UniProtKB/Swiss-Prot annotation:
Catalytically driven reaction(s): AMP + ATP = 2 ADP
Family: Belongs to the adenylate kinase family.
TM region positions: none
Function: Catalyzes the reversible transfer of the terminal phosphate group between ATP and AMP. Plays an important role in cellular energy homeostasis and in adenine nucleotide metabolism.
Pathway assigned in UniProt: Purine metabolism; AMP biosynthesis via salvage pathway; AMP from ADP: step 1/1
Domain statement: Consists of three domains, a large central CORE domain and two small peripheral domains, NMPbind and LID, which undergo movements during catalysis. The LID domain closes over the site of phosphoryl transfer upon ATP binding. Assembling and dissambling the active center during each catalytic cycle provides an effective means to prevent ATP hydrolysis. Some bacteria have evolved a zinc-coordinating structure that stabilizes the LID domain.
UniProt protein name: Adenylate kinase
Keyword ATP-binding among UniProt keywords: yes
LID: region residues: 126-163
Name of the encoding gene: adk
Length: 216
């Protein structure tokens, strides 16, 4: 089960990815986490990435693909994985497909989360997470059962991302529609795209996602 979750920031991809991980036991692969791990461990590609970052430059698609490739080769990905926040562009999508093909692998499905812009801005403007386990909360939509205590791990420490505000969100959406939304047509043309209503309640979205996964 090799998945890509596609949709604008705030569409609920992270929440649904967590649920897929818990139910199906496949890892959620974030390029940021993979990059930090590769640099920390000091793999060959990690050293290349560190040299680029130390020079204050952006890590190239080539290096990111190499890091994703390296991560997919690890044993916990044998039964599948979820790509989180990647690919972001058509160039990255082509490179990802070529990388998987070289391993004799293929994507199982790409799930698109559809949410209108006004709702996305509202969601992100009130979002915060548990600093310990990363569980996502919202000022009005999802607060901890016990005030100030994470439902999942019991931590009392929470954090808000500096860019989780309306002004920044509007800019992020502009980038998404320019660079990432073309992937919807790309994967539709390949017969890989399935869409869910990201405006629905979280549990209903999960039901839709599981319905898609059950047909794989």
């Amino acid at each position: 089960m090799r998945l890509i979750l596609l949709g604008p920031p705030g569409a609920g991809k992270g929440t649904q990815a967590q649920r897929i991980v818990e139910k199906h036991g496949i890892p959620q692969l974030s390029t940021g986490d993979m990059l930090r791990a590769a640099v920390g461990v000091g793999t060959e590609v990690g050293k290349r990435a560190k040299a680029v970052m130390d020079a204050g430059k952006l890590v190239s698609d080539e290096i990111v693909i190499a890091i994703v490739s390296e991560r997919i080769d690890q044993p916990d990905c044998a039964n599948g994985f979820i790509l989180d926040g990647f690919p972001r562009t058509l160039v990255q999508a082509d490179a990802t497909e070529a990388m998987l093909k070289a391993k004799g692998l293929d994507l199982s499905v790409v799930i698109e989360f559809r949410v209108d812009d006004q709702e996305l801005v509202r969601r992100v403007d009130g979002r915060y997470t548990c600093a310990q386990c990363g569980t996502v909360y919202h000022d009005t939509d999802k607060v901890p059962v016990e005030e100030g205590v994470c439902d999942k791990c019991g931590s009392t420490h929470f954090k808000r991302r500096p860019d989780d505000n309306a002004e920044t969100m509007i800019k992020r959406l502009e980038v998404y529609y320019k660079e990432t939304s073309p992937l919807i047509g790309y994967y539709y043309a390949k017969g890989k795209l399935r869409s869910v209503d990201g405006m629905a309640e979280i549990d209903q979205v999960t039901t839709e996602v599981e319905s898609i996964l059950s047909k794989l």
